[in-house]
C-alpha cells in the first residue's frame, strides 16, 4: 500500500506537483504546475482541496506570480504581487488558510522591500517551502494532542476529508488515526461518504485503506444508526474556518453530524490548525459560504440523478454551532468552552 500525498514540491525543477483528487479513487495521477493561473484553476476545480492544502498551494502560486513580476522597482513588483494575491484569494472564499498564506507571502515581500527584487523572489520561494513544512509539523502536533482524548479500541466517525489528502501530510482529523496505527492500537473508523462530492468515500476511505487502517464507509444518512448502535465513541472532523466564538465552518453535513453527536452524548472534536481560526470573524453568521455548481447534486459519473432543470441549492459548507462542539484541538493545545475566551488565550501563548 502506497502513501498518498496531496502536495509535492520539485526543488530541482521549481514545480508544484498536485495529486488530482477529482479522479480518485479510480486513478492516481499527479499534475505539475508552475504558474499562478494554473494554481488558481487547481484550487477552483478542486484538484487540490482541504483548507491547509489550499493554503500551501496558494503560497506556491503566489511565488510563481512573483517569478514573472516586474523587476524594475519594488513598487511595480508589489503591485503585481497584490493583484495576483487577490486573484488567487478569489478561488475558494470559505477557506481562511487561503488568505492567511497569501498574507504571509505579501508580508514577507514587504519585510524585504529594500532588497533587490530578484532576491525577494528567491525569498518568497523559500517562504512557500517553509509554509509547506510548517503544515506537516502542525498536523502531527494536532494528532499528538488529539490522541490524548482517545484510547485503544475507540470507534471514530469522521466526515468529509480532513486527512492527509487535505493537508501536506498526516491530516488534521486523521492525524491521531495515523499515530494510533503507529502505536499498534486496534480501532475502527467510520467515514461518511459526504454528498455531493463524496470526499469521505473517494478520499478519506481511500487514504485510510491504503494506510492499513480499519475503515468502513457509510452514507451520510447512516450516521445516526451507527451512533445508536454504540459503534462511535468520538466524532473528529476538520474545519475550513472557526469564528471567534467557536462556530465552525466545515463541509456541508458537518452540522447535522454535530446535532446527532450531541443527542447521543458523543464528544465532537474539531481538528484545527491555528491558521483556520479567524478571531476577526465574530460568529458563524459572518463566514461566507460558497455555493457550488448545481450539477454536483443532479448528476454523477455522467448520469443524471435528478430531473434536468430542477432547482438546486448546493452550499459547499455549513456552520456547526459552538454549543455542539466538545473541544477544538490545535497544534498549540486543546481548547474547551467557553471558546470566545479560550481561543483568545490560545493566541496569547
From Swiss-Prot:
The record marks 160 as: Transition state stabilizer. Its EC number is 5.3.1.-. Keywords: Carbohydrate metabolism, Isomerase. Signal peptide: none annotated. The keyword Isomerase applies. Pathway: Carbohydrate degradation. It holds the Pfam family IF-2B. GO terms for molecular function: S-methyl-5-thioribose-1-phosphate isomerase activity. The active site is at residue 240. It comes from the Bacteria. PANTHER family: METHYLTHIORIBOSE-1-PHOSPHATE ISOMERASE. Belongs to the EIF-2B alpha/beta/delta subunits family. DrdI subfamily. This is 5-deoxyribose 1-phosphate isomerase.
Amino acid at each position: 500500500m502506497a502513501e498518498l500525498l496531496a502536495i509535492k514540491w520539485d526543488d530541482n525543477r521549481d514545480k508544484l506537483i498536485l495529486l488530482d483528487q477529482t479522479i480518485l479513487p479510480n486513478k492516481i495521477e499527479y499534475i505539475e504546475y508552475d504558474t499562478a493561473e494554473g494554481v488558481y484553476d487547481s484550487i477552483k476545480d478542486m484538484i487540490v482541496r482541504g483548507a491547509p492544502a489550499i493554503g500551501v498551494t496558494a503560497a506556491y502560486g503566489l511565488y510563481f506570480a512573483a517569478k514573472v513580476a516586474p523587476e524594475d522597482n519594488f513598487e511595480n513588483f508589489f503591485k503585481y504581487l497584490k493583484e495576483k494575491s487577490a486573484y488567487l484569494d478569489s478561488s475558494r472564499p470559505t477557506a481562511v488558510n487561503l488568505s492567511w498564506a497569501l498574507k504571509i507571502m505579501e508580508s514577507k515581500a514587504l519585510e524585504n522591500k529594500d532588497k533587490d527584487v530578484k532576491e525577494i523572489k528567491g525569498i518568497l520561494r523559500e517562504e512557500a517551502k517553509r509554509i509547506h513544512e510548517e503544515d506537516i509539523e502542525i498536523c502531527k502536533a494536532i494528532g499528538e494532542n488529539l490522541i490524548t482524548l482517545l484510547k485503544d479500541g475507540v470507534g471514530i466517525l469522521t466526515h468529509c476529508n480532513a486527512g492527509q489528502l487535505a493537508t501536506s501530510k498526516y491530516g488534521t482529523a486523521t492525524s491521531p488515526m495515523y499515530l494510533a496505527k503507529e502505536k499498534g492500537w486496534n480501532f475502527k473508523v467510520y467515514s461518511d461518504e459526504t454528498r455531493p462530492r463524496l470526499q469521505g468515500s473517494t478520499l478519506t476511505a481511500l487514504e485510510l485503506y491504503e494506510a492499513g487502517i480499519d475503515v468502513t464507509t457509510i452514507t451520510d444518512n447512516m450516521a445516526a444508526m451507527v451512533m445508536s448502535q454504540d459503534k462511535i465513541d468520538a466524532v473528529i472532523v476538520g474545519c475550513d474556518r472557526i469564528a471567534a466564538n467557536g462556530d465552525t465552518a466545515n463541509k456541508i453535513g458537518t452540522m447535522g453530524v454535530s446535532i446527532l453527536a450531541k443527542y447521543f452524548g458523543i464528544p465532537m472534536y474539531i481538528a484545527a490548525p491555528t491558521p483556520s481560526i479567524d478571531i476577526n470573524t465574530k460568529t458563524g453568521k459572518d463566514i461566507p459560504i460558497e455555493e457550488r455548481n448545481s450539477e454536483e447534486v443532479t448528476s454523477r459519473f455522467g448520469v443524471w440523478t435528478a430531473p434536468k432543470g430542477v432547482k438546486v441549492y448546493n452550499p459547499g459548507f455549513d456552520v456547526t454551532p459552538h454549543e455542539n462542539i466538545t473541544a477544538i484541538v490545535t497544534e498549540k493545545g486543546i481548547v474547551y468552552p467557553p471558546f470566545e475566551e479560550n481561543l483568545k488565550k490560545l493566541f496569547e501563548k
